Amino acid sequence: MGADLVVVTGASGYIGSHVVSNLLSKGKNVRATVRDVNDPERVEHLRNLKIEETGSLEIVEMDLFDSKSVDSAMTGATDVIHTAAAVIVRSKNPQAKIVDPSVIGTKNVISAIEKSGTVERFVHTSSTAAIRPEKWENGVTLTAKTFASDATLEENPYGLAKYSAEMIVRDWHDNLEDSEKIKMITIHPCMVFGPPLSSRHLSGSLSVIMMLMRRELPLILPMQINIVD
């Protein structure tokens, strides 16, 4: 595949791990960023992934709040898939624990992309929380142009985090000069179910399955889920 290098942020997470696995199965060169390269729960399952002959895997430590480590991780990349973010929806300190990782982290990632001068494609992993307002009329169709602009730190910190990060990447991309334009895609997953690659993946969306098995939730959930196979 030549000199192409795909950087996957948040590679130890549930979505990030599956992205890395998929890329390696296609023979891609992958640089996977994790918070702690010495934590077996974060890296062991990545090291055990099958790598096709033309591919390679490099695991590096990166802190979203440390711009220098983000800059280093992006060096030489041709593609960036940004999946790193806080996945909790409630906290005693929602600004620091939920909003800041998405907002500051995303700002550092796009700054590093600009500095690299090599990135051609960027995928930003957002969420339906970014396009789902707190209130909407019955029958309305939520789209990538329907934003959670009414999300607040007190009532919906996760939605605020995802909405804010979405606005950051869109504004950044819109303001790039034509000569600097890179291809950008934002995706908006809802709840994500599938095989866990690490014990750490049993939280988040997969915790719903565990709660159903333990009969802690009704079989018919009081929520809306967009089903995509």
Protein language model features and the residues they cover:
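N-terminal Rossmann NAD(P)H-binding glycine-rich loop of SDR-like oxidoreductase domains
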Residues: 2-30
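Conserved cofactor-binding/catalytic machinery of classical short-chain dehydrogenase/reductase
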Residues: 66, 105-108, 164-165, 229
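NAD(P)H-binding glycine-rich loop region in Rossmannoid oxidoreductase-like domains
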Residues: 36-104
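Active-site helix of classical SDR
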Residues: 161
